Amino acid sequence: MTQQKYNVLRDQLSDMKYLSVEMRDALPVIVIRHADFSADLAIQGAQLLRFAVQDSEWLWLSETAEYKTGTSLRGGIPICWPWFGDAAKNPPSVSNYINMDNPPAHGFARSQDWALGEVSESD
């Protein structure tokens, strides 16, 4: 399935000047290389992995990060939803709605594949 998602992204980004897609081990990553900044965005978890302005890295992942399907990437800026941290330590207004055994830390959005709905570029 990952190869299929990669192919869909490649087709979506084929006419883009600054955007492309590459595989990092098992995960497709959208790569943005603009004259003013660069960034990497994982499709799994819609997670910002890297951001740099000119040659100054502002955000990055550990060199030991593992790009595995279904495994949350440590670092970057993840989407922590629908809860943050240990599900049991969230307030009752959140934890009362969690009805799964061993819920993942920071919710399930981090390990789900997201889809690119729309894309545009500007200079």
Predicted regions and their residues:
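Surface-exposed acidic/polar loop and edge beta-strand patches at domain peripheries
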Residues: 2-123
